[in-house]
Curated annotation (Swiss-Prot):
Residues 798-810, 1406-1417 have a biased composition (Polar residues). The keyword Transmembrane helix does not apply. This is Zinc finger protein 646. Belongs to the krueppel C2H2-type zinc-finger protein family. The keyword Membrane does not apply. It comes from the Eukaryota. It comes from Homo sapiens (Human). Residues 26-47, 94-200, 313-346, 660-810, 901-931, 1103-1148, 1274-1294, 1377-1481, 1509-1529, 1606-1672, 1781-1832 are annotated as: Disordered. Residues 1460-1475 have a biased composition (Gly residues). The gene is ZNF646.
Amino acid sequence: MEDTPPSLSCSDCQRHFPSLPELSRHRELLHPSPNQDSEEADSIPRPYRCQQCGRGYRHPGSLVNHRRTHETGLFPCTTCGKDFSNPMALKSHMRTHAPEGRRRHRPPRPKEATPHLQGETVSTDSWGQRLGSSEGWENQTKHTEETPDCESVPDPRAASGTWEDLPTRQREGLASHPGPEDGADGWGPSTNSARAPPLPIPASSLLSNLEQYLAESVVNFTGGQEPTQSPPAEEERRYKCSQCGKTYKHAGSLTNHRQSHTLGIYPCAICFKEFSNLMALKNHSRLHAQYRPYHCPHCPRVFRLPRELLEHQQSHEGERQEPRWEEKGMPTTNGHTDESSQDQLPSAQMLNGSAELSTSGELEDSGLEEYRPFRCGDCGRTYRHAGSLINHRKSHQTGVYPCSLCSKQLFNAAALKNHVRAHHRPRQGVGENGQPSVPPAPLLLAETTHKEEEDPTTTLDHRPYKCSECGRAYRHRGSLVNHRHSHRTGEYQCSLCPRKYPNLMALRNHVRVHCKAARRSADIGAEGAPSHLKVELPPDPVEAEAAPHTDQDHVCKHEEEATDITPAADKTAAHICSICGLLFEDAESLERHGLTHGAGEKENSRTETTMSPPRAFACRDCGKSYRHSGSLINHRQTHQTGDFSCGACAKHFHTMAAMKNHLRRHSRRRSRRHRKRAGGASGGREAKLLAAESWTRELEDNEGLESPQDPSGESPHGAEGNLESDGDCLQAESEGDKCGLERDETHFQGDKESGGTGEGLERKDASLLDNLDIPGEEGGGTHFCDSLTGVDEDQKPATGQPNSSSHSANAVTGWQAGAAHTCSDCGHSFPHATGLLSHRPCHPPGIYQCSLCPKEFDSLPALRSHFQNHRPGEATSAQPFLCCLCGMIFPGRAGYRLHRRQAHSSSGMTEGSEEEGEEEGVAEAAPARSPPLQLSEAELLNQLQREVEALDSAGYGHICGCCGQTYDDLGSLERHHQSQSSGTTADKAPSPLGVAGDAMEMVVDSVLEDIVNSVSGEGGDAKSQEGAGTPLGDSLCIQGGESLLEAQPRPFRCNQCGKTYRHGGSLVNHRKIHQTGDFLCPVCSRCYPNLAAYRNHLRNHPRCKGSEPQVGPIPEAAGSSELQVGPIPEGGSNKPQHMAEEGPGQAEVEKLQEELKVEPLEEVARVKEEVWEETTVKGEEIEPRLETAEKGCQTEASSERPFSCEVCGRSYKHAGSLINHRQSHQTGHFGCQACSKGFSNLMSLKNHRRIHADPRRFRCSECGKAFRLRKQLASHQRVHMERRGGGGTRKATREDRPFRCGQCGRTYRHAGSLLNHRRSHETGQYSCPTCPKTYSNRMALKDHQRLHSENRRRRAGRSRRTAVRCALCGRSFPGRGSLERHLREHEETEREPANGQGGLDGTAASEANLTGSQGLETQLGGAEPVPHLEDGVPRPGERSQSPIRAASSEAPEPLSWGAGKAGGWPVGGGLGNHSGGWVPQFLTRSEEPEDSVHRSPCHAGDCQLNGPTLSHMDSWDNRDNSSQLQPGSHSSCSQCGKTYCQSGSLLNHNTNKTDRHYCLLCSKEFLNPVATKSHSHNHIDAQTFACPDCGKAFESHQELASHLQAHARGHSQVPAQMEEARDPKAGTGEDQVVLPGQGKAQEAPSETPRGPGESVERARGGQAVTSMAAEDKERPFRCTQCGRSYRHAGSLLNHQKAHTTGLYPCSLCPKLLPNLLSLKNHSRTHTDPKRHCCSICGKAFRTAARLEGHGRVHAPREGPFTCPHCPRHFRRRISFVQHQQQHQEEWTVAGSGAPVAPVTGRGDLPLPPPPTPTTPLLDPSPQWPADLSFSL
C-alpha cells in the first residue's frame, strides 16, 4: 500500500487506493460533498479493526474476511493443484473455476474526474437550479393555479394533507403534457422554462413493472418535488445499529444491515460455499441468479440492473461514432431484449425511466385541457374515459395476484395487468413482404433522445421526486410512491401466514416469499386469478404483435383490453366488458352485450401463412441453434447443473432437465387421481380430448406470431416430450406427434413417462389427429376464442396485417358465447368460461423454469411466451455438426456432408432435407425441415468437455445413435457401422421399409442387432443377419414407404405399450422395461424387476460387469456386453468383439427371446436356482476370480469406457456417469438438512439423502415392514424363510457369503463389503483432518470421523445395554433378534459333519473360541472352526468333556469375570471383558428332552448353591453332555415345559422370564442380567486398584499387575478363601489381570497371555492357552503394555485408550472417569440424541432398551415384589429392598455381602439365600453345556 502513487490517495484521510474507481467509491462513502443530495453522515464508524495492520471495517464479516490475508501457509487449490500463500488468495483464485454464468460481472466504477458524474459527485446548486435557472420548485409550478377546474387532477387535500397549495400553472402542467421541446428542455439547467413536466413522457423505458403499478397504486401521490434543503443527517438517519453505530433512514435498511452481524457458518445451498454472516450469503446468492437482461448496445457485456448499464454506457460516451454491438438488442420495460429498439441508442432518459407509460391506456398528444368526468370514489382521481376509470379501480382490488409467466407477486389487479403487459411487448415481426416491420418511434421519444444525446449529463442524476418525510429523492414517481409505503406504519398482517409487519413495504416484501407456494397452491383461486391461465386467455397481445403498424395509442389500448379479464380476488367482482367498460351483474348479461361488438370482424380475421423463420435461437454455451425458443429452452436445461431439489419428495438432481422430468411424475399421479374421479364415460372422454385439443392449439398460438410452426410441425412441446428419452432427439417432426406430445405435456403430464400408459397415449394421439384437420395452417394465428367457441378458420387474423380494435370484441364475444367449456383434466363442463377459469386452479400445474433467467412458470405455453422476451443468442462459428443416425460429430459442414453420403448413402437427399436442415440452418438460417437434435448423451459430452480443461484439445467421443455405444476414434465407429451395414444381404429379415433408402435400412439393421444382443448377449454381425425374425419385425412396427422419414419420423413403435421412437436404439432401450422378471446380479446379489433396471445397475457398478457370465433371466444391457444371457460355450469370451463370432443360430435366438417375453415364475425360480448353483464356488476360488474380474474391467475400460476421471483415473461409458462420479471428488463438509449428518463429498451426501427421501415401496407381506430397496426386503424375508423352514433348506453359509478376505478369512455376502473390509488391513499413518489424531488403517480413520458429525451413532459392541455379542465368534449385534439369527448360523454349521477336523465339532470350536478368542470378531458363517490347541498341539476332539478343562481339573472353568482364578474356583460366572464390566451369558442351545435328568440343582427358582454364579446366566440349565439334543430334535423350556423348534426361540423365551440374578458383591437381586451388570458398575467405579491378597491399593492397574506377579512367585497357588472378597478386580494370575475402570464394551476378552509365544497352563486352574504362533498369525496387532492381541489395528488403538489412566472429567457433568475409553463411552450419554419417546408420558430415551424398561412403569402390575406393610408392588429387588429400609424392617442390605432375608415374592417362591463366604461358588461336579453363547 505504501508504494501506491500519491495521485491515488484520498486528500482527506491520506489513504491510498490501487485504482481510481476505488478512490471514487471511497470518497462517495466517507467524504461526500456537503451539498450533495441524500447526504451521508460525515464519518461512518468502522469499529472492527485488524490488530495486525490496523485496517478498519464496518462489518465483522469484512474483518473476518480480511484476516485471512494474514494467514500464511500453503493453501492448495483442490481443482488445479495450484498453491497459494494465504486463504484469501486461494478464495480469489477459486472464482476462476466457477461456471461462467455464475461469475459476477461488475461494471467499471465511474471515474470521479469524468464530466458525466459531476451531477453526482460534484455538488450543484440545488434541485431548483436543475429545474430552472432562477426558480425553485414552487415557482416553477406556480402557473397551475390559473385553471379553476379541479377535476383534471386528484384533490390533493383529500389524499393525505401533505400537498402544498400548488400554483395554477402546475395544475395546467398536470392536466396536459408538454410538447416535445418543452418535455426535453424542461429538465435541463440551461433553459429558463417556467414549466416542469408533471409526469414523465410516455415512451418505451426500463421502468420496472412494479413501479408502473405503483405509479397508479392506492397510495396517493402527495407532492414529490420538495425544496432542496434536506433535513440534517441525524434526523434523516433515525435507525442506528447498536453494535457498530451505523445509521439508516429506514427500519428495513437497519434490519438488513443487522444480518451482517449474525456471525456463524452459512453455506450456500447451490455451491456449498460458506460465509461468515447472513449478509454475505445473501449477496453471494445473487451470483446464482444468472438473470442479466440489460445488454450494452456497443459491447457484449450484460448487466443485472439498469443502473449498472447506465454507468457502463458512460464509458462509451466518447465512442459514439464506433459501430454499436449489432448482435444485442435494447432492454425493454420488463428488462428483456427488444429487437425493435436495435437502431436506437438507449438514452439516459429511457434507462432511468423518465419516460413512463400511462396506465390509463392512452397517450396525451396535446397540452389542451380536456373534460375528465369520470371520478374514482375511493381516491378522487379523474379520467376522461370510463374504461380508464374501470382500469384504475383495479388498483383498489387488493390481494395476492401472482403472475403466471414469472415469479412476481403483485398486490392488486391493476399491478398484475401492467405487469402482464410487459410480457407482451411487440417485438420485431415479419411483415407482409418479409421485411422487418418495426413500429415507428413516436416523435416525442425521438426528439427527447436527440436532445439528451447532445447533452448527456443533464439528466443522469435528476431526482425530482423527493419524500417529504425523510428527504430521499427518486428519479421516478413510481419509485417515490413505492418508497412511501415504508412510512405507512401500523400493523400489517400477511394474509398467507400469521406474521405481522410494522409497515406496508415490509409486508409487500414478505409476500414475495410466498410466491412459489401461492402459485402452486390449489386454493389460489380464492385470492387471485388462475395462475396458469391469466395471460393465455387474452388474444389481444398476439393481435398487438400482429399489427405492428398500428398507432401506439391503439397498442396501449389493446393491451389494456387484452388483460381486462378481471382476476377476482374474492370471486364476487362485477362482470366488466373489456371493450367499452360497462359493468354487468352476471355473465349472461355480459355475454349478450358482447354480441354487439362482433360486427365487422370477419373481414379482418383472415389467416395467411408466413415464411418459415430462421434458426435465430442459439445456445450460448455450445452454439447449437433452433427455430423456436422452446427448443432452446429444452436444450439449455442440459447445461443447467447444480443442486436442484424437488419440493415434494426432497430428492436432489444435478441438472434442471432431470428435475423437471422428475416433477412430471408427481403431476402424473395427480392427473391419474383426477381422471379416476371423472369416471369412464365416453362422452366425458370425448369432451376432454376436444377441449384439450382446443386448449393446446390456442396455448401454442397465443405464444406469439414470432415463432410459428414449420410445415414439419416442430414445436417446443415435442421437444419437451422427447427430452427424457435417452438417445432420442429433442424435436418432434410431424404434426400428429406434435399435437399428441403437446397435449400430453400440457394436460396429461407424466403419462408419457410410464411405459404402461402407452394405450392412453395412442388414444390421445388418435383423437387429437382426428380433431386437428388443418394440414396447411400450422402457422396460423389461432386465437383462444376460436378454440373454445368453434370460430371458423377464415376468421383467424392475418399474420402480417394490422387488425382493428374490433377483433377483440369478436374474441370476447366468442369467449363468452361458448356453449360448454370442458376441463381437459377432469371432464367437468361449465356454461361459461369464467367457471372454467375458476375451476382450473383445482388441478395443480407443473413447474417450468426459464433457461435464461430464474423465473418459473406453471405451464409450457407460459414459458414459451416468456421466452420470447429474451433475445435469441447468436450461433457460434465453431458449432459441431452431429449426425442423428450414428451420433458422430464433425467440426465442419463439409465433413458432415461427406459422412452422410458415404456412411448413410444419403446422396439423394437435398440440402434442405430433414437431416441436413439442422446443420444448414445454423449458417443459412432458412432450413425447410426440422431435423432431429443431438442425443442426450452427446449433450452431456459437450458439457463435460467444457468443464474439464484437460479435454480442450481432445476430440469428441463418437456415439452410435442406434445402439448407444461410444468410441474414442472415428475408425472404431466406422468399423462398427461397416459391421452393421455388411449384414444387409438376402438372408436378413425382409425389411418393411421398401425403398426407403440405405440409411433407414442400416438403422433397422442396427435395431435388429441390438434386439438380438439384448436377448442373447452375443450380438454382432451374425446376430444382425440372423436375428431379424418375424417376432422382431413385428415388435418394431416399422412403417415403410418412399418418404418414410418425412411422413412418419417416429417409425419404431413398441408393440406392448405403443410408444414410438425415432431411432431403433431407443426402442431397444425401451423394450427392456417390458422384460420383467427377477434379474439377479451374481456379484452383489441384488435383484431387479426388469431388464432396464438391471442395465442401470450394471452402469453404476462396473465390478459387476466383469463377473461370471449368467444364464436365465439376467440379460445383459444393450450396448454394454459385459454380461451375457444364456449359457456361454467353452472358450467364449465376454467381450463384445468376440461375441460377434460365436453364438446360437436363429432358432435358439427366437427361443431365448420367447423365454424372455413370457417366462413363468416357476421357471424363473428354477433358472435362478441354477444360476446360483453354477456361480457359487468355493471360498478359495473367489479371490482369484475377483482379481480376474478387476483386470477384465480395466481391459474393457480402455476401449469401451472413453470417459475417464482426471482425478482418480476411473473410466465410464457415459459422460453422465462421469459427471456423477466427479461429485465424489468435491470434498468439503456437506451436511444433511434432515439429520445434520456430515459427509466429506457430494456423492456421499446424495446417496445418504435417499434414506430420507426415497419412499419405502417394498413391503413385507408377512409383517408389514417396508423398505426402500428390494434387496433390503429380500434380506428381511430371509428371516421369515428361516423361521418357517428351520434353516433346513438354506445352503451352507459359505455359499451365502462367497467373498472371503485373503488375509483374515472373513467372509461377506457382497463384494462391496469385502472391499470395505480390506481397508482395515491397509496399515499406515492416517491422520484425521479435523483433529490431530492418527490411525494405523483407513477403516479406523473412517470410523473415527463419524465422531465429528453431530449425529453420532454407536457402533455395535460399544453400547452399554443394547448391543449383544456372540460368545462363539465375538461378533456384536445391535439386538437380540440379530443375535438369534446369527446363532442359528452357528447351529447349522455345527450340524454339518466336520470334514477333516478329526471329530472336532462346533461345540469344541465354540469352547475354543471361549478360551482363545473370546470377544474378537471372527469370520462369520463361512469360517472354519478353529481347533482348540493345547501346548501348540491340536486336540482332535473331546465331545464328552469341555476342552477348556485341564487334565487335573475337576470342574470346568468358563472365562471368569476377572479373567483369573481364586483358589481354583472361578470368581464369576459371566464373560469377562477388558474393563471388568459384567457380560451376562445366555444359553444358546438348551435343547433337551423333557425327561432329561438335571444334574445341577440350578433350576427354576431354587438354584441355591450356584446362585450368584448361575443367576447371571439367565436360566442356564447345566446338564450332561450326554443329554445334548441330536440335530432335528426340539428344544424345551426346563421351567414351563414349552417346546420350540429352534434354539433361538427358546433363548428368546428364557430371556423374558423373571429369574433372579444376584450381585456378587452385595447379593442384591435383579430380574435380568442387564440390570445386574449395570449395578455391578457402581461397585467398580467406587473402588480403587486394590490387591485381593493384602488389600494394598494402587494408583494404576500396571502397579497392581506387578504386585500380583510378586504374590504369584511366592505362592504356588491361590488359597480358596480368596473368593470371599467377591471383588470383580480380584482376578489373579501371572499372566492375566483385569482391573476396574477400563471401559465396558470391549471387543476382546480379558484373557491375556504372559508374553508372545509363551504358552501357560495353570496347574490348578486347568486353563489351556492356544499356541501363540497361531494367535500371532490371526492377531498381528499386540498391545505392548498388557500383551493383548487384535486382528485389526483399529481395535488395538481403541484398546490402548484403556491404559491412559487418570482422572478424566466429563465436560458436561461433574463425573470423573478413570480412562479415556470410559470417558468416550460416557460422553455418548450426553451427545447421542434421545430418539425413543414414550407414547404415554413423552419422556425420551437414547436407546430402545431404556424405553422398554421405562415402559414397565406404566404397566398395570409393577412387579412380583409386594410390600407386606403397604400395597405397593416392585419389579426389582433393589427397589423393594430400598423400600423396606424405609419401613425400618429387619431386612437390610449389607454392602459387604451380608445375607438378605428372604422376602415373599410373586408365586410365594422363597428367594435363595446368598452364598456364605465358606460356600464355594461352583460345584466342581456338574458338566458344562455342550454349546454356549454369551451376549450382552
